[in-house]
């Protein structure tokens, strides 16, 4: 698909999705030609989407990135969610050779030392497994919301991901956190217990802290960096330096 046609399809989808509810948005994507993949980090937004996919038995693959540095609570929630909705959540792991190359170059926790080292860690533990999860997909469904951070304030319902050659679908783009929480309570959706301990946004354990009163939702992610740097690269294009020079290039 050309750049122009990808962008045109994304714009048309964005306009159609806006008037639908969550179930309708997901059903529309599930009915399109091409493979649809939802990647979940098991956060509260993602649990809302997973529940909708499971309850409505939609033809959407659910996948998660097992980085090797997740909270125990997150790991436990994967199996609980599978059992609750009778679905399979496919696990994608980093390559052992990539981890070894990262540790040799930066150290196990080198991500605290520089933005380059942190991006490199995300590249190995998230971006490369993500590439495998999305291989051959036409539509990538995410839990992005406009209220999560300033970087995401203009998130559309559908957008062309030219780098990956697919369309990214953000069915919760217009939901605020209060709506999310009310929906979770009403539908008895299982969520990460860390949300109740001051963690509205949860990533890898070494890179996530509880937020302070009045802080933005994602203030606890990579808190030692400037706000504009606080993305892992899944939803923001990364610099070439994010990939370890001597690491395995296997997808």
Swiss-Prot record:
Binds 1 [4Fe-4S] cluster per subunit. Keywords: Cytoplasm, Iron, Iron-sulfur, Metal-binding, Oxidoreductase. Its main location: cytoplasm. Pathway: Sulfur metabolism; hydrogen sulfide biosynthesis; sulfite from sulfate. One of its GO terms (cellular component) is cytoplasm. It is found in: Cytoplasm. It is an enzyme of class 1 (oxidoreductase). Signal peptide: none annotated. GO terms for biological process: cysteine biosynthetic process; hydrogen sulfide biosynthetic process; sulfate assimilation, phosphoadenylyl sulfate reduction by phosphoadenylyl-sulfate reductase (thioredoxin). Belongs to the PAPS reductase family. CysH subfamily. This is Adenosine 5'-phosphosulfate reductase. It comes from Sinorhizobium fredii (strain USDA 257). The lineage of its organism: Bacteria, Pseudomonadati, Pseudomonadota, Alphaproteobacteria, Hyphomicrobiales.
């Amino acid at each position: 698909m050309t750049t122009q046609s990808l962008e045109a399809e994304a714009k048309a989808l964005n306009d159609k999705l806006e008037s639908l509810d969550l179930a309708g948005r997901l059903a529309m994507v599930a009915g399109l030609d091409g493979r649809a993949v939802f990647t979940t980090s098991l956060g509260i937004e993602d649990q809302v989407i997973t529940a909708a996919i499971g309850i409505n038995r939609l033809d959407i693959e659910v996948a998660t990135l097992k980085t090797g540095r997740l909270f125990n609570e997150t790991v436990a929630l994967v199996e609980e969610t599978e059992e609750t909705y009778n679905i399979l959540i496919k696990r994608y792991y980093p390559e052992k050779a990539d981890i070894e190359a990262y540790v040799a170059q930066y150290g196990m926790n080198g991500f605290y030392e520089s933005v380059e080292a942190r991006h490199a860690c995300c590249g190995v533990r998230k971006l490369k497994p993500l590439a495998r999860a999305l291989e051959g997909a036409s539509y990538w469904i995410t839990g992005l919301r406009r209220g999560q951070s300033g970087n995401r304030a203009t998130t559309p319902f559908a957008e062309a991901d030219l780098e990956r050659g697919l369309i990214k679908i953000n069915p919760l783009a217009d939901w605020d956190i209060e709506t999310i929480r009310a929906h979770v309570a009403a539908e008895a959706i299982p969520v990460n217990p860390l949300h109740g301990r001051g963690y509205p946004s949860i990533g890898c354990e070494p890179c996530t802290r509880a937020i302070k009163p009045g802080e933005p939702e994602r203030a606890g992610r990579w808190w030692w960096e400037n706000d504009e740097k606080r993305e892992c690269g899944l939803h923001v294009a990364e610099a070439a330096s994010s990939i370890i020079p001597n690491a395995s290039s296997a997808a």
